[in-house]
Structures are given as C-alpha cells and as structure tokens.
C-alpha cells in the first residue's frame, strides 16, 4: 500500500534533503532560473511557491519564517523586496518546470525550473558585476 508516502526521498537523509532544498531555493531566488533533475525540480516547486506566498504577505513573521528556511540574508531581501511585489496579483503558479533533455554522464532526466515572469538579466548578474569590478580595479 502507498500510505504516508508524501514526498520523494531522493536517496538522502532528512537533514541532507532540507539543506539541499534550502540551497536550491537560494539559487533559484538569486538567478531566477536553475537547471536540475526532474524529481528535484518537482519537489522544489511547492517549497518555492510557499516562499513566494510568504513574501506576498510581507510582515515580520513571514520574513522570519523565510529566513529560517533560507541560508543567506540577501536571498530573503530579494524575496521580499523584488519577488513578493512582482507576484502580488498572481494567485499561485509562480514557477514553471521545462524538460531539458538528459544528463550526459548518467542519462538523468534534466529540467529547467524558472520563475514565470522572470528577469532575464538576473541570471549571471553577480558574475558580470564581479568581472566588471575586477576590470575596474586593474
């Protein structure tokens, strides 16, 4: 029987899964698009949707709840200052999952998970800023 099987274990312990999804949420918030395996993307979707809902609420308690799940304060700041207002009118469905072929090494099915109305310039912005800062320093 299939009782009490509410999520995928992904061959990881509870602590490892929690840390992995926390890191993936931070990466998705920062870059607004990440490439991962299909099962991880499907498990990440409800987690990040709940984070956006917290950001739409916008109060102090919601900010503290989000900070308890995310590892970096810059991700919490972007979540509440950029993503929350962006999706204020949308009632759910903040992310999409698109199939992206298979990984070369082990043929794992890959997917791209991204925000629906994402900022195209957000992906790689930190790297571009770092390269420009290094160029200015020289």
UniProtKB/Swiss-Prot annotation:
Keywords: Ribonucleoprotein, Ribosomal protein. GO terms for biological process: translation. Pfam families: Ribosomal_L17 (PF01196). The keyword Iron does not apply. It comes from the Bacteria. Transmembrane segments: none annotated. GO terms for cellular component: cytosolic large ribosomal subunit. InterPro entries: Ribosomal_bL17, Ribosomal_bL17_CS, Ribosomal_bL17_sf. GO terms for molecular function: structural constituent of ribosome. Belongs to the bacterial ribosomal protein bL17 family. Part of the 50S ribosomal subunit. Contacts protein L32. This is Large ribosomal subunit protein bL17. It comes from Jannaschia sp. (strain CCS1).
């Amino acid at each position: 029987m299939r009782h009490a099987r509410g999520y995928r274990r992904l061959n990881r312990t509870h602590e490892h899964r929690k840390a992995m999804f926390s890191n993936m949420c931070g990466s998705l918030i920062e870059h607004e698009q990440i490439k991962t395996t299909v099962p991880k993307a499907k498990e990440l979707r409800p987690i990040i949707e709940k984070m956006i809902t917290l950001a739409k609420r916008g109060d102090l308690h919601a900010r503290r709840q989000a900070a308890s799940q995310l590892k970096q304060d810059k991700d919490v700041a972007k979540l509440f200052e950029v993503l929350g207002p962006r999706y204020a009118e949308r009632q759910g469905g903040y992310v999409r999952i698109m199939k992206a072929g298979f990984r070369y090494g082990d043929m794992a099915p890959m997917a791209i998970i991204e925000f629906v109305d994402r900022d195209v310039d957000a992906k790689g912005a930190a790297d571009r800023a770092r390269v420009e800062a290094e160029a200015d320093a020289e």
